[in-house]
């Protein structure tokens, strides 16, 4: 069901304001188990029902590594310093990150590279 941005959980609203301050919400939808948000720039964010983000993807511009915990960001920069982030998905104890070099890399919350594959 389509909702007003003010209908998003406070944690989701705060995350968008902090991480994408100049990118207004174009569309917000509430589903049974999550929320889907589209920003004006084309960035799409999926939130858990509690407002914590679970997936961010950007078809037109790279995502900032600052969206990741420091340990994960540092491991990614060390492995692929020139690659741009297109999608980030939170897993239970790791992150799945899609890069512009057609790689998907899996990094644990503490920065250990768990694996990668060519997409």
Predicted regions and their residues:
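Long, terminal "pre-/pro-" and other extracytoplasmic accessory regions
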Residues: 1-119
């Amino acid at each position: 069901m389509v909702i007003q941005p003010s209908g998003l959980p406070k944690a989701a609203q705060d995350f968008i304001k902090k991480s994408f301050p100049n990118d207004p919400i174009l569309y917000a939808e509430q589903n049974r188990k999550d929320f889907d948000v589209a920003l004006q720039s084309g960035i799409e964010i999926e939130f858990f029902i509690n407002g914590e983000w679970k997936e961010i993807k950007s078809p037109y511009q790279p995502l900032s590594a600052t969206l990741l915990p420091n340990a994960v960001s540092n491991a990614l920069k060390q492995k692929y310093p020139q690659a741009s982030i297109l999608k980030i998905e939170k897993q239970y104890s790791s992150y799945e990150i899609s890069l512009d070099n057609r790689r998907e890399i899996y990094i644990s919350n503490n920065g250990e590279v768990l694996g990668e594959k060519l997409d």
